[in-house]
Regions:
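N-terminal hydrophobic/helix-forming segments and targeting peptides
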Residues: 1-351
Length: 351
């Protein structure tokens, strides 16, 4: 069972849009929810910082942005993360064919709505009818019926609601699920610091975090980054309640912090697995079949460790999900409850 207060909060946050690079109105919503729970909230470029009475006791981070579209011209819409990340041939940093292949067709018949990026004001609704690759810009273009009046720079979010289905919750969970968990921590009396970052899906959030730590952090700073972790099937996702990592494609994580999470899981009887080890084991099988190995993945934690030269260290805690980056992404209720229990115990353990 989920705490009714958490469930109510999650429903509210899911309904508010937060498209990559258009998170400002969502930060307003988070500010209200956090201040109602007693947090001191400060805005910086690309990051909303919420602090309790003992800010240095424990620090968590979660990215606030979600996938969506951006209007880039008359009746023209592109994948917002690609636009925000400047991932076009114009800068010799094109989107890979593999990545474009995942996006094309994924959102067909998806209901969407446009909003004003600063206020969140509703600007009309539509439906995605088609997506294709533009050969001139090597980027994905979406056809949206109903938003012909949208002007360039208008974000377009996926229409979404929280659904309960056979012991699982479904919505565009990445990353509103861990955002809600972080806000809920303040309901439970959290005294530390929570960072809510922008543009993670475009690979930029770590820059905003690092800038804050360079300005306000100590000589060393331990951070726990919260996120979802994708699996191909519900069966695979259900094999563990929590996903940990020792590293990602960018850097090794803090061993002591990772071991602490493992210890807390073991003490509470929470099943877990290491995603990097899981992928590496899969790659052994793929290579034996002559197939291309998969990447162990790139995370906000790895990016900031790699770039900070020892200033920021830490590890990740993730919720296993299926239906990645869609409005049908799902997580087991048991996993979500275990996740909230785990980070609550971690916060208490750090104080």
């Amino acid at each position: 069972m989920l705490d009714p207060q958490f469930e109510d909060l999650l429903r509210v946050l899911i309904r508010h849009p937060s498209v990559v690079a258009a998170e400002h109105s969502y930060f307003r919503v988070l500010q209200r929810e956090l201040e109602e729970r007693g947090a001191n909230v400060t805005w910086y470029e690309g990051v909303l910082v919420a602090q309790g009475s003992d800010p240095s006791s424990c620090m968590f981070s979660a990215h606030a942005d979600r996938h969506g579209l951006m209007c880039t011209g008359p009746n023209e819409f592109q994948f917002a993360a690609f636009v925000a990340g400047n991932r076009t041939d114009l800068l010799n940093n094109s989107v890979s064919e593999q990545l474009m292949g995942k996006v094309i067709g994924r959102y067909e018949n998806q209901a969407v709505f446009a909003y004003e990026p600063w206020s969140g004001m509703y600007r009309g609704k539509g439906i995605i009818t088609n997506s294709r690759v533009c050969p001139y810009r090597n980027n994905v273009i979406f056809d949206v019926d109903g938003l012909q009046s949208a002007v360039a720079g208008t974000p377009v979010a996926f229409q979404d609601n929280l659904v309960f289905n056979d012991g699982r919750i479904e919505a565009q969970l990445d990353n509103v699920l861990t955002i809600a968990a972080l806000v809920h921590l303040f309901t439970l009396g959290f005294k530390g610091t929570a960072f809510f970052t922008a543009e993670e899906e475009a690979g930029k959030s770590w820059r905003y975090l690092l800038e804050w730590f360079r300005r306000f952090g100590g000589s060393t700073n331990q951070l726990y980054v919260l996120d979802t972790s994708p699996y191909d099937t519900i069966e695979a996702a259900n094999e563990q309640l929590i996903v940990l990592r020792e590293k990602d494609a960018n850097a090794k994580f803090n061993e002591a912090a990772t071991n602490k999470i493992q210890r807390l899981c073991e003490e509470a009887g929470i099943s877990f697995m290491y995603k990097d080890k899981f992928v590496e084991q899969q790659n052994v099988k793929l290579e034996a079949l002559g197939e291309k190995p998969k990447s162990i993945g790139s995370t906000e934690m790895g990016r900031i460790i790699s770039a900070s030269n020892g200033l920021v260290d830490g590890t990740t805690i993730q919720i296993p999900t299926t239906g990645y980056h869609t409005t049908a992404e799902s997580a087991s209720i048991e996993s979500v409850a275990a996740f909230i229990s785990l980070i609550s115990k971690l916060a208490l353990d750090e104080t």
